[in-house]
Amino acid sequence: MTTWLLLVVCLGIACQGITSVTVRENSPRKLANSMNVIHEWKYLDYDFGSDERRQAAMQSGEYDHTKNYPFDVDQWRGMTFVTVPRYKGVPSSLNVISEKIGNGGRLLQPYPDWSWANYKDCSGIVSAYKIAIDKFDRLWILDSGIINNTQPMCSPKLHVFDLNTSHQLKQVVMPHDIAVNASTGNGGLVSLVVQAMDPVNTIVYMADDKGDALIVYQNSDESFHRLTSNTFDYDPKYIKMMDAGESFTAQDGIFGMALSPMTNNLYYSPLSSRSLYYVNTKPFMKSEYGANNVQYQGVQDIFNTESIAKIMSKNGVLFFGLMNNSAIGCWNEHQPLQRENMDMVAQNEETLQTVVAMKMMHLPQSNKMNRMHRMNRVNRVNRMDRMDRIDRMDRMDRMDTMDTMDRIDRMDRMDRIDRIDRMHTMDTMDTMDRTDKMSSMDRMDRMDRVDRMDTMDRTDKMSSMDRMDRMDRVDTMDTMDTMDRMDRMDRMDRMDRMDRMDTMDRTDKMSRIDRMDKIDRMDRMDRTNRMDRMNRMNRQMNEYMMALSMKLQKFINNDYNFNEVNFRILGANVNDLIMNTRCANSDNQNNNQNKHNN
């Protein structure tokens, strides 16, 4: 059965948003062990190809292990992507985790290759913050163009790669008036969400945390829109944050975002805030950006702490990192957006210090599970192919049967027509025979009468002959009238027989049509039942969450201890996470799920 993986990236940096959830005492869930560590690093290192090249990179300042911090993670098939914001000493900003292991952990390989790590002429990938993989196997990369978190090196861009070929499909350079706040001149693109309806009709939402704006990119016409709202601004009350008991200051606006596949709501929070907001994206799909069309909603101060990373499950459960709690919280969007409807699904002060990235995965991390998923998918496809072939054979058999019935009907009609023709011929011959016989008898009668008349007086004979002629004419007319009536009756009988035969033919055709309609309805019902079964199987698929965690305050203060683990990628089954929580399925959710599927 296909599963999804929720990828949570935890950095040794403290996140700033914690929900108002609290861990219930006597809870049967072991929150400390609810997520499994997949990868971990003391520091990030790269596969340079040889020790000589690594030493040369270190001596030139191209690589400095103290300046490399993971910021986002995603997975496609066997590749796990990791982004590293560009600082001096970062050799590559977009990478995949290799099979090679160094002193710090798994080595990173630049994606697609080392040539794209060259940023000085702005032709490569300068500084990748967030990435997203859509359902059409495309990798979207948000390149801020900023190095050292402050210096604009190149114009911000969107890079799009085909993951099947690792070839770039598109590179979109953002206009300056879109990328920065015109009033303050500030700008910093740090987060993106991709909404792909089809390969052309795709929308990308980007968060500008320094310029307090939401940028919308329409792939169909390559247009940009910069949206502003006070819900994007940071809250002055929360610019001083706490992480693992240490405080730091940040004045960042809209940051973490998540898109609901069920309601099309885009959920977001400013980094320096404890509020949760959302906007419905349907107006954006229609290119309606007016104030009357776009409505921003949400609840202020709904969290107990700041929240950075957010992700949405396919069933409408929002997961969010809780900075000062070293935890991950949840809320089911089928419930009212209230503090009491939120809950905590994972908490660990060692492995979940600050969750800076989370992803939902279509496939589990295990290769064995991947193979099982592919085998199940192939078996389902083969079963559907076999059923389609059987349906086609059944239709062909029915068509052959109908052809045979049509041939039999035509032969029956021809036989009936032949019989009618023969009957008509025989009737005609009988009529002629009767007429000949009657004529012969009339002639004999007349001869007899003539003989008798010879013995009679001529006058009497003449009178008698006149009377007889008149009688003969009357008899002949009566005979003709009788024959005409018989012919009319025969014709009426034949017409009645033909009408009855036509009625029988029409009845037979109607019966065949009714049978075919019933068969078609049964076929449609069978196909519908198969689709329903497939939909039920899809709804029953598991999801896996993957998270990236690190110590945020260490990142800001640049005082990591690289002799201990600082960065971790963790994973967990979503159903296991939300089990026995307020975020589990409800009747309201099931009803909304059915409406969404319809």
From Swiss-Prot:
Pfam families: MRJP
Location relative to the cell: Secreted
Family: Belongs to the major royal jelly protein family.
Keywords in alphabetical order: Glycoprotein, Repeat, Secreted, Signal
Lineage of the organism: Eukaryota, Metazoa, Ecdysozoa, Arthropoda, Hexapoda
Cited InterPro entries: 6-blade_b-propeller_TolB-like, Royal_jelly/protein_yellow
Tissues expressed in: Found in and secreted from the hypopharyngeal glands of the worker honey bee (at protein level); expression peaks at 8 days post eclosion. Expressed in the brains of adult worker bees peaking at 12 days post eclosion (at protein level). Expressed in the spermatheca of adult queen bees (at protein level); Expression levels are higher in mated queens than in virgin queens. Expressed in the heads of worker bees after eclosion, expression dropping with age and detectable up to 26 days of age.
Descriptive protein name: Major royal jelly protein 5
Function in brief: Component of royal jelly, a substance produced in the hypopharyngeal gland containing proteins, free amino acids, fatty acids, sugars and other nutrients, which is fed to developing larvae by worker nurse bees. Major royal jelly proteins (MRJPs) are high in essential amino acids and probably have a nutritional function in larval food. All larvae are fed some royal jelly (also known as worker jelly) early in their development but it forms the principal source of nutrition for larvae destined to become queen bees.
Expression induction: Unlike other major royal jelly proteins, not down-regulated by the ecdysteroid 20-hydroxyecdysone (ecdysterone or 20E).
Glycosylation sites: 148, 164, 181, 324
Annotated SUPFAM superfamilies: YWTD domain
Residues annotated as signal peptide: 1-17
GO cellular component, as recorded: extracellular region
Keyword Glycoprotein in record: yes
